[in-house]
Amino acid sequence: MARRRKGRPVNGVILIDKPTGITSNDTLQKVKRIYFAEKAGHTGALDPLATGMLPICLGEATKFSQFLLDSDKRYRVVAKLGERTNTSDSDGEVVQTREVKVDRGQLERCIAKFRGTTDQIPSMFSALKYQGRPLYEYAREGIEVPRESRKITVYSIELLRFEGHEVEMEVHCSKGTYIRTITDDLGEMLGCGAHVTYLRRTGVSNYPYENMVTIEDLEALLEQAHREERAPRELLDPLLMPMDSAVQDLPEVNMIPELADHVLHGQPVQVFGAPQDGIVRMTSGDERLFIGVGHIDDDGRVAPKRLVVFRDEEEK
């Protein structure tokens, strides 16, 4: 007898506006509970201090979350000059206080040095792992371990405001970029130290900012459904973005349903007009039903890489 699954097979991406003070995983678990979803996963953690866009993949969409992990991000950050902390943000302890002698011209010149591709050494207070343990666990024990620098790209970094000891910036960057580290490095470059006091992620990939919803929004809809004796999915599911929204930047290969059936059974197929190489987004029929992500094999065929498993709500 098949084991009954806990939750329902809901598929899609919900753009959560994460509040400050809770972890990304706590946010994920709340969304999973509200949607009563079988599976859920987020697409790149935000610090507890940070707020903003946290795409959460539900159901089959979790298979494609890596593409969002690898996508560009946008942030709004406020930094305080004159104080350096052990975490590079206001959640940490002040370890050094220095006088601030910085003018706007000097600040803008230093900020400009972060544009482009550079090497960044991740903060000890990060979720990256060393010998199987997150770096922040070592940091809390007062242990510093070696970290390899990583290539990051800052596509743009703009100074929005400079008042007193406060600096506000907007950053568009590649995956794996630590805004706290940029802020700490900026403070050292200026000779006065700095740390993050406010951080908001305003963009992931091409997802629209206005489509974000809060946990409170979802809880209110859940309560409304209970009051009106309606199925919660009637109010909650319309907020979901399609699961292939995570891979919208990939070239599409549309195929007739007969070929799609072969692909869904693990067989590569020849599709007229497909790219000659690379990763592709596969769709079926005139309705362009998303069936998964594939790649072009050595024979020029479209071969499955990650496939959607289709199940009805009643099949739980």
From Swiss-Prot:
Catalytic reaction(s) noted: uridine(55) in tRNA = pseudouridine(55) in tRNA
Covalent S-S links between cysteines? none
Record SUPFAM superfamilies: Pseudouridine synthase (SSF55120), PUA domain-like (SSF88697)
Q: What EC number is given for this enzyme? A: 5.4.99.25
Pfam families referenced in this protein's UniProt entry, alphabetically: TruB-C_2 (PF09157), TruB_C_2 (PF16198), TruB_N (PF01509)
Among its keywords, does the record have Protein biosynthesis?
A: no
Tell me the enzyme class: isomerase
Alphabetical list of CDD domains matching this protein: PseudoU_synth_EcTruB, PUA_TruB_bacterial
Q: Does the keyword tRNA processing apply?
A: yes
What family does the database annotate? Belongs to the pseudouridine synthase TruB family. Type 1 subfamily.
- The name this protein goes by in its record: tRNA pseudouridine synthase B
Where does this protein come from, organism-wise?
Answer: Aliivibrio fischeri (strain MJ11) (Vibrio fischeri)
